[in-house]
């Protein structure tokens, strides 16, 4: 019979994207079959590597701070998010979150991929200007 699981905060890992995540719900931590959820903390000036999640959707809830996210096939769009905002990223959409502010950004991230990093595909976009 399946059992409920408790994952205590505090342990973390560095994702392929170049950001630090606090371990949460995943196939690795709980045996989940269809969901992954983590806490992300982005220090001032932090930026993820451009990437997308193959075949998996992402939902984000911003707890604290102001972040920006470039998105689109050439990262041509910019979305500004703040505390209390929800963000939806469809599967396969390139994106790059970054923190242009002088404060920390905290967000809860959930994906329909139960694995922590399996569906992360890094993009080679070195010629694309990085956020300042």
Regions found by a protein language model. Name each.
Residues 39, 52, 71-73, 99, ...:
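Residue-level recognition of conserved beta-strand positions in structured domain cores
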Residues 47, 56-83:
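A short beta-strand-loop-beta hairpin characteristic of the jelly-roll/cupin
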């Amino acid at each position: 019979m399946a059992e409920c699981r408790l994952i205590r905060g505090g342990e973390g890992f560095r994702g392929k994207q170049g950001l630090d995540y606090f371990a949460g719900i995943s196939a690795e931590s709980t045996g989940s079959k269809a969901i992954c959820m983590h806490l992300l903390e982005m220090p001032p000036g932090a930026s993820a590597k451009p990437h997308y999640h193959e075949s998996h959707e992402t939902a984000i809830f911003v707890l604290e701070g102001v972040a920006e996210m470039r998105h689109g096939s050439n990262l041509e769009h910019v979305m500004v998010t703040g505390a209390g905002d929800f963000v939806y990223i469809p599967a396969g959409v390139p994106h790059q979150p970054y923190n242009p502010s002088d404060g920390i950004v905290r967000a809860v991230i959930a994906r329909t991929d139960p694995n922590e990093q399996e569906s992360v595909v890094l993009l080679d976009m070195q010629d694309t200007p990085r956020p300042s």
